[in-house]
């Protein structure tokens, strides 16, 4: 289980994350999605202790299976927490196909179930209405 309590993070005087609290059960696949510039990458970097390498600060508590991540070797931590950064998408496919890769990786093969999970995730992130008509378009053209 990943547990985050009152996570704040920033660089210099600019605070980027403002008190995030979140619990992710062991084995649950979780996507962090949102508009450009909202702090997704910074949030993910806190989970792998990359913020400190870039001169950032953070406060709050992040524990992985009950252990504070500050006490875990970075290499071990980075093997346990998977991340995909918002660099240009590696696969020149549709948005829908790119979103389906993680589901297929975790054993979801049924096309209807994949479509439902993609829709559900986009709705939770409040992005569905924005991208629903673009799901079949190339992700490289966004």
Model region roles, listed by residue range:
Residues 49, 61-76, 136:
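ABC ATPase NBD Q-loop/coupling interface
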């Amino acid at each position: 289980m990943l547990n985050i309590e009152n996570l704040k993070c920033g660089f210099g005087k600019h605070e980027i994350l403002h008190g995030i609290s979140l619990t992710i059960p062991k084995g649950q696949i979780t996507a962090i999605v949102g508009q450009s510039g909202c702090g997704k990458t910074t949030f993910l970097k806190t989970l792998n202790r990359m913020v400190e390498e870039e001169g950032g600060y953070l406060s709050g508590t992040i524990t992985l299976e009950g252990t504070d991540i500050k006490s875990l070797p970075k290499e071990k931590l980075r093997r346990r927490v998977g991340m995909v950064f918002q660099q240009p998408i590696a696969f020149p496919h549709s948005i829908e196909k790119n979103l389906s890769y993680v589901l297929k990786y975790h054993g979801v093969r049924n096309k209807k179930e994949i479509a439902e999970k993609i829709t559900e995730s986009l709705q939770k992130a409040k992005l569905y209405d924005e991208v629903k008509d673009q799901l079949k378009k190339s992700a490289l053209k966004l």
